[in-house]
Swiss-Prot record:
Keywords: Amidation, Neuropeptide, Secreted. PROSITE patterns: TACHYKININ. The modification Methionine amide is found at residue 10. The keyword Protease does not apply. The keyword Secreted applies. It is found in: Secreted. This is Scyliorhinin-1. One of its GO terms (cellular component) is extracellular region. GO terms for biological process: neuropeptide signaling pathway. Tachykinins are active peptides which excite neurons, evoke behavioral responses, are potent vasodilators and secretagogues, and contract (directly or indirectly) many smooth muscles. Belongs to the tachykinin family. It comes from Scyliorhinus canicula (Small-spotted catshark).
Amino acid sequence: AKFDKFYGLM
């Protein structure tokens, strides 16, 4: 998912 990548930064 796209959010998966964003959460990876967190």
